[in-house]
Amino acid sequence: MVRLAPHLVKPLPMIVPAFDGERPDRRLGVGLNLYDVMAVDKLRGRRKRDGQQDGDDFGGDWSPERHRIIEGDEVIERAPALAAREPTGGYLFYDCQTDDSRLVLTALEEAERFGAVVANRVDAVELVEKNGRAVGITARDVESGEQFVLNAANVVNATGVWADRLRPAELHDDAGLPKIRPSRGTHITLRNEDLPLNDGVIVPAGEGRSIFALPWLGSTLVGTTDNNYDETDLDHIKPADADIDYLLDATNSFFATSLTAADISGAFAGVRPLIATGDPKKSVDISRRAELYETGSGMITITGGKLTTWRRMAKMAVDRIVERDARDAPCRTEEIPLGQAIDAAQLPRVEGLPEEAYEQLAGRYGYRARDVLAVAAESGELAQPIVESGPLDLLAEVVFSARHEQARSVGDALLRRSRVALLAASEVAGEDRLVARRVAQAMATELGWDAARVDAEVDGFLDEAEAEGIVAHSSSAA
């Protein structure tokens, strides 16, 4: 992904610190050697086979390095939050990081460019079958409630954790289903000044587990947990108070801090679509592998996996259809860039915007940042941050999301087109409603909402924020 979308997927140095005169763990060094072979050397080998040099991949100029041992001073330089613990050294290795919402939206935009039809706020109600074969789905417009049939030569169920809810008739009573075993992962965000990091840090969390503390979108991201999720509601996954305590305790213990729930900028949880194995393993011990299966109806289901493997999973599904239909259509997505990177210095300037805003827009939208800035230039108000003294996300991005990215609610704009609600949850979901109303009013101009609809949208967002649990609570503070 760093090759296909260099503006969206960024290199992230990761640190495993050592303290009190310890030498870095040799067993970890062995593991990192294996990581180098599987990731670094594999990527370099592919570039060599393709005749590529570092820096010629769609504007990407990064090639991963093998891990190395670093001194304590460099650990502190990369992770100032560790200064109080006086690290003596550590391992440094490389991973990558993205804003998943922007990656998904960019992939959808590219799909549209190749002829796909993408629709927000449409539910898949049930599979449509004819003579035992899947021939489409019954869909529902969430806003109007209208149901309609979408006919298709091939039906692919790529609904993630919801995959078991779209079944052909032959499987309705199958005792072997569901195949999905949901696992909840919880994250918290902190102000960078409260836990300053320039690079990522692996944090021991007890019982042989580890979590991560990472610089993310101008804040610090801490996560993740990995627990069985047995509730039926998959639409709103709320962080458990105990999980928030777990993350805070591990962070405070490792960084010698005294952070509380009041210091958390935002919290969120998601559900992984793990493949059920039929044994009582904890979710953390279940493989993250992807699985594709086809039933007698002809419907193909692709599930499991993770964000890192999303393109390969899509290839698996389409390759199966191509093979089944005896067509000659080799996959090309390994060579198709996602969006178009742009240097922030090439973006047009809008009066009043700080220089950091251009860097953020270039990293978030690529070349389309020019279109966002054109919206910002329409009025001084749109060039202002959504949250005063908060993240740099602009009100113009809200309008852009409604105009070009099918955002249909305040939640769409603040939770699923940007991450501002997860970085400044108390401000965005505050009782004074000022931020939510400001966003709703900006969207109203684009979507034709009247005053009553604006009020309803503000209420709806605050209800959604509560259901998603973005304002963190601690069980110890309850």
Give the residues covered by each predicted segment:
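C-terminal accessory subdomains/tails of enzymes that are appended
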Residues: 8, 19-38, 44-48, 52-54, ...
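Helical element adjacent to the flavin cofactor pocket in flavoenzyme catalytic cores
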Residues: 91-154, 314
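Flavin-dependent oxidoreductases
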Residues: 130-133, 141-214
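A structural signal for short hydrophobic beta-strand segments in well-ordered beta-sheet cores
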Residues: 124-127, 212-213, 292
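Long, low-complexity intrinsically disordered regulatory segments of eukaryotic signaling proteins
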Residues: 3-6
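Residues that recognize and position ribonucleotide moieties
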Residues: 68, 117, 148, 181, ...
